Amino acid sequence: MAACTARRALAVGSRWWSRSLTGARWPRPLCAAAGAGAFSPASTTTTRRHLSSRNRPEGKVLETVGVFEVPKQNGKYETGQLFLHSIFGYRGVVLFPWQARLYDRDVASAAPEKAENPAGHGSKEVKGKTHTYYQVLIDARDCPHISQRSQTEAVTFLANHDDSRALYAIPGLDYVSHEDILPYTSTDQVPIQHELFERFLLYDQTKAPPFVARETLRAWQEKNHPWLELSDVHRETTENIRVTVIPFYMGMREAQNSHVYWWRYCIRLENLDSDVVQLRERHWRIFSLSGTLETVRGRGVVGREPVLSKEQPAFQYSSHVSLQASSGHMWGTFRFERPDGSHFDVRIPPFSLESNKDEKTPPSGLHW
């Protein structure tokens, strides 16, 4: 757990995982450097892929940690399913699924764009489609390898005490889309190193996968459901840069005789082209139900100006926003720079900030 510090951004490594597995024969051995978190598919009859020297610690050798399974085209992965993240490259385990509404503006029916309006920016109407995401634990051994490129993911909560702005985090907890999961099996009874793994999951060799939910996991999920729930996902692509936004409601606090509502939002930027680009600026418009419209401009995101290349095509981070109203909207643009110095703007899909008006008190810590 100590290896996964409570930071809120996650840079992404190469896409070579998904490329190297295309057309593969299943099952395939899954290998890692002993004590390390970087993986490589083991050899087949035609190809052999090893860890690169930049990722493999000096003196470490590859060892088999599991066998890849065929990814599910239909249906859901069960609690206890081990997986490799196809984009981030970390080992993880599925805790439970979320059924989200995916609003994908790339597949929306072509409609005349409308002028921007304070309710959230006009543009084409998008219908939500049900899509499966998963709450997962990240293997602590892999966090240092992710953080070589950026920072590791954590889920943040409002602290339940006098400081209305205080946050606490659960490191190594993430949300993963169904298509990002590369499932594998392992004979290890504790294949994932995370402080919560053995608290949440019990080894049962008669089951498939051989890890079942403990009562502590079910109780924790029920207790913290309002603050963990993933309901809406928004996605849009501009000039081969895809932006995915997932908002989460965190709760309400009273400050100076007024109510302050808090949200967390997670953003993933993906370069779908081979050209190298760098994020330079962000430009946000934040509309509150109270009638205020705020503009926020700044350099980069979370103190970084990430480069998106063919080798490292994606970057993910989380941030927070508060309003003195129970709902609102956010939208905006990211400005990217090409190697020749030219710039282009990438749209951030508009998303709603909705609160739960019959909410209970947000959690003050880990509830079992």
UniProtKB/Swiss-Prot annotation:
It comes from the Eukaryota. It holds the Pfam family DUF525. Keywords: DNA damage, DNA repair, Mitochondrion, Nucleus, Phosphoprotein, Transit peptide. Residues 235-360 form the ApaG domain. One of its GO terms (cellular component) is mitotic spindle. GO terms for biological process: error-free translesion synthesis; mitochondrion organization; mitotic spindle assembly; negative regulation of macroautophagy; positive regulation of focal adhesion assembly; positive regulation of mitotic cell cycle; positive regulation of mitotic cytokinesis; vascular associated smooth muscle cell proliferation. The modification Phosphothreonine is found at residue 292. Residues 1-51 form a transit peptide. InterPro entries: ApaG_domain, ApaG_sf, Hemimethylated_DNA-bd_dom, Hemimethylated_DNA-bd_sf. GO terms for molecular function: DNA binding. It is found in: Mitochondrion matrix; Nucleus. PROSITE patterns: APAG (PS51087). SUPFAM superfamilies: ApaG-like (SSF110069), YccV-like (SSF141255). NCBIfam families: PRK05461.1 (NF003967). Interacts with PCNA and POLD2. Interacts with SSBP1. Interacts with PRIMPOL; leading to enhance DNA polymerase activity of PRIMPOL. Interacts with POLH. Interacts with POLD1; leading to stimulate DNA polymerase activity of POLD1. This is Polymerase delta-interacting protein 2. The gene is POLDIP2.
